[in-house]
Amino acid sequence: QHVAGVYYGDDSIISISHALLEIFNQMTIAKSMEETGHVYTDETKSGATRTHKRLDEVTFLKRSFKNVGGKINAALDVDTITEMVMWKRKGLTDQEAVQQTSSHAGFEAYLHGKGFYEWFTKQVNGKLDSLGLNSGIATYAEYEKLECRFLSTFTSDTDIMAHLTGR
């Protein structure tokens, strides 16, 4: 009712209602963990120096939370997206690798909004065109349709959380 969290190894993201923030927060969690011999740090590994942060100040598993067109996207770190298209898995042809990697990177770029998406796809498509390869990156509108189709499979925010947490 007042606390929801997602945990992956030593990474976590926790939402705490304002009603509890005075007694249960990042600082009190760090203090309790210290008493059991564990060190609790925020995502910057600088320690817990504040009781809480706004969602737009948090990262989790290399994702930050961006308001794009009135919805919050869990956007992958830009450096990670740009690095994705620089690597090739063994056993794939150049075209297979490009199709696989660039379509995934294109969707990740889409989550940052149209400005970054257009810059990113222009860079990738320009380079691939010069090599005679086709990126397979969908248009921004196609990613919008794909996202709408995916989100329409859920009937509530609870369904989405259950999908994300595997419960």
Label the predicted regions.
Residues 19-31, 35-39, 49-167:
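Active-site and adjacent loop segments of nucleotide-processing enzymes
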Residues 45-46:
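Non-transmembrane, aqueous-exposed alpha-helical and coiled segments at domain scale
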